[in-house]
């Protein structure tokens, strides 16, 4: 595309940007119905003619990261609160993450996924086939998307994941609503799963999304409540040394909560961090060498005990290594990352099977395997 043509198209897109309202923000939620319950980062408030979606800043308590005003075909800016106005349902969209594409597919709206980033990480047949047939545009890397392709495609919205102290570069100047999906920063499993309601609103399938969430919440809480009665709770740690650093989930993290809900005592449960702790082997060994279970995620390989020891010889000193307590998930060969964000009940079920196998005698592990 020639430079003059590119500039002309950008200018045209800027003129077509969705209308923004001029109303005040203080009373934005008054008179509306709140649709969210568990999420700490997302508040959905429904009014007669629009829905306000507030995304809290995960890195700054009390600060709003983004506000979206979801409206139907017409938009009367004088009646709307401040925010990025998004016309819904979306008929086209650029989706950065396979996680979000997966739940859009579950809602029956995969035809509205018309462009993706990081196409090589998609495992869904519906997206792979549409990429091959030219029905989905490959917009390149999510870290540096192909702006010219995006301009040419002109999706109705862009769904991406925000990062701390990082903007979206040229994408923000295209006049296309950028939907910041901060669900991955939620600390609770059901809090993250509740973002399906936002996705449902964006694609015109709120009722289906609400039903999906309610079923997930019932399944998760039912199993959690049963497991809460177990007489003994094994100890567990996660991941392994990589380039000299052991990235251990913080005690206030999503994974720590799932471990607890699955009936295990996470060794770093007394830590309040919601992110990953960067530890050396000596620190982990001193505190957790006798942990009963050791869960590891890999990409592109099925781990063996020999490989684990070869990666870092001192791994073999962990008690779980010798006693059959090491389990690994090859995330490149399974759909774990696509499944669990909006279906934490599948991850909970997997961990309950590992920690308390007799409680789920019929269930067979889907993602993890014992490392031998």
Predicted regions and their residues:
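Bacterial Sec-exported substrate-binding components of ABC uptake systems
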Residues: 19-101, 208-237, 322, 335, ...
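Flexible, glycine-rich surface segments
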Residues: 223-306
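A short, structured surface patch at a secondary-structure boundary
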Residues: 54-55, 59-151, 158-163
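C-terminal soluble interaction/assembly domains
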Residues: 268-270, 274-359, 363-372
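Structural recognition of the beta-strand scaffold that forms the well-ordered cores
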Residues: 92-95, 112-116, 157-161, 178-181, ...
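Positively charged n-region of N-terminal signal peptides that target proteins for export
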Residues: 1-5
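Extracytoplasmic substrate-binding proteins
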Residues: 135, 146, 152-245, 269-270, ...
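Bacterial N-terminal signal peptides
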Residues: 7-17
């Amino acid at each position: 595309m020639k430079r003059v043509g590119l500039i002309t198209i950008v200018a045209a897109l800027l003129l077509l940007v969705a209308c923004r309202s001029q109303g005040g923000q203080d009373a934005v939620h008054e008179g509306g119905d709140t649709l969210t319950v568990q999420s700490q980062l997302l508040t959905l408030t429904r009014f007669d003619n629009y829905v306000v979606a507030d995304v809290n800043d995960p890195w700054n308590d009390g600060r709003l990261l983004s506000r979206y005003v979801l409206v139907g075909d017409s938009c009367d800016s004088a009646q709307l609160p401040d925010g990025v106005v998004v016309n819904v349902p979306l008929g086209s969209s650029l989706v950065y993450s396979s996680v979000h594409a997966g739940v859009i597919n579950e809602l029956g709206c995969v035809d509205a996924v018309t462009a993706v980033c990081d196409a090589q990480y998609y495992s869904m047949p519906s997206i792979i086939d549409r990429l091959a047939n030219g029905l989905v545009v490959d917009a390149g890397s999510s870290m540096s998307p192909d702006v010219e392709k995006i301009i040419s495609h002109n999706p109705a919205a862009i769904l991406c994941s925000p990062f701390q102290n990082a903007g979206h570069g040229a994408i923000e100047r295209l006049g296309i609503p950028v939907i910041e999906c901060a669900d991955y920063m939620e600390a609770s499993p059901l809090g993250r799963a509740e973002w399906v309601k936002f996705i449902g609103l964006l694609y015109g399938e709120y009722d289906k999304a609400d039903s999906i969430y309610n079923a997930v919440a019932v399944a998760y809480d039912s199993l959690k409540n049963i497991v809460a009665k177990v007489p003994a709770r094994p100890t567990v740690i996660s991941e392994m040394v990589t380039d000299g650093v052991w990235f251990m989930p913080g005690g206030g993290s999503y994974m720590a909560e799932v471990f607890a809900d699955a009936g295990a005592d996470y060794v770093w449960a007394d830590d309040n961090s919601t992110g990953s702790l960067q530890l050396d082997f000596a620190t982990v060994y001193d505190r957790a060498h006798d942990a009963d279970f050791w869960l590891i995620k890999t990409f592109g390989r099925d781990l063996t005990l020999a490989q684990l020891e070869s990666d870092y010889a001192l791994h073999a000193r962990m008690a779980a290594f010798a006693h059959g307590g090491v389990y690994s998930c090859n995330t490149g060969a399974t759909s774990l990352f696509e499944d669990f964000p909006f279906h934490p009940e599948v991850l909970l079920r997997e961990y309950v099977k590992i920690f308390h196998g007799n409680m789920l005698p019929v269930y067979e592990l889907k993602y993890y395997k014992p490392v031998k």
